[in-house]
Regions:
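Rossmann-like NAD(P) dinucleotide-binding subdomain of oxidoreductase/dehydrogenase enzymes
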Residues: 121-229
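Short N-terminal micro-motifs specific to bacterial/archaeal maturation
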Residues: 19, 34-37, 56, 74, ...
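Histidine- and aromatic-rich ligand-binding microenvironments
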Residues: 7-9, 21, 33-44, 193-198, ...
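Hydrophobic residues in alpha-helical segments
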Residues: 8-9, 54-58, 76, 164, ...
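Glycine-rich loop-to-alpha-helix module at the N-terminal edge of alpha/beta enzyme cores
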Residues: 28-119
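Terminal low-complexity tails and localization/encapsulation signals of metabolic enzymes
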Residues: 1-34, 67, 71, 121-146
């Protein structure tokens, strides 16, 4: 029996009320995996956990954040062959492209790990006597990330890495056509030194989980790549 792959919410792997099978498009006899679909209550749990965790993450020093992103990137690059093969099985992409995509995803994380240490502000004179202008960047808060199936690891990493690097929490809804790659990336992130709830994986259909996510007042920013009906 195929083990059900679960959502990652508030620091725990949790099952859902329904499941879907993911089939290898180049071999329809192969079930890549069975994946839990998040409920509306579980999405609310993820949103609340993300809000709490983001406040804690914002207190982490820059080097500590850099270490987290660097570790994610290094593991992705080291496991590019393994995870690229998984990506190709569920999406149908040639093996060389699947492996290259995972390696590139790792580079996104190491790039933004370096950017963590380059965060700078600015000061300027005011037009008023005795006043200084202080310019600084602050986290947005909780970011919803909705990513596509055609580059399931690279596009998601391109969004997740900068969101985490600059102090935000993440709720990620991947495309339902490529959940195995999403679980693999989430498993790497889940093992890092981050607050519980800072990163959440909520799998499900766009018309259900995605729609509720973008309409939620608990979301401060949305990064979306894909299409809508």
């Amino acid at each position: 029996m195929t083990k059900t792959q679960m959502n990652y919410i508030a620091g725990d792997w949790v099952s859902g009320p329904t499941e879907i099978e993911n089939i290898n498009p180049s071999d329809l006899s192969e079930v890549v995996g069975v994946f839990a679909q998040a409920s509306s209550d579980q999405l609310e749990d993820a949103l609340d956990a993300a809000r709490r965790a983001q406040a804690e993450w914002a207190t982490y020093g820059l080097e500590r954040k850099q270490n987290v992103l660097m570790a994610i990137g290094n593991e992705l690059m080291a496991r590019a062959e393994e995870l690229g093969t998984l990506l190709s099985r569920e999406e149908g992409k040639p093996l060389a492209e699947g492996k290259g995509e995972v390696f590139r995803a790792g580079q996104f994380f190491t790039y933004f790990a370096a950017e963590v240490l380059r965060q700078i502000g600015d000061t300027a004179d005011s037009t008023r006597d005795g006043i200084e202008v202080d310019v600084r960047r602050e986290p947005l808060g909780v970011v919803a990330i909705i990513s596509p199936w055609n580059f399931p690891t690279a596009t998601a990493s391109w969004k997740i890495a900068p969101a985490l690097a600059f102090g935000n929490a993440v709720i990620w809804k991947p495309a339902n056509l490529t959940p195995a790659s999403a679980v693999a990336l989430s498993e790497i992130i889940s093992r890092q030194d981050i607050p519980k709830g800072l990163f959440n994986l909520v799998m499900g259909a766009g018309r259900d989980v995605g729609q509720r996510l973008v309409e939620s007042p608990k979301i401060d920013a949305i990064s979306f790549t894909g299409s809508v009906p």
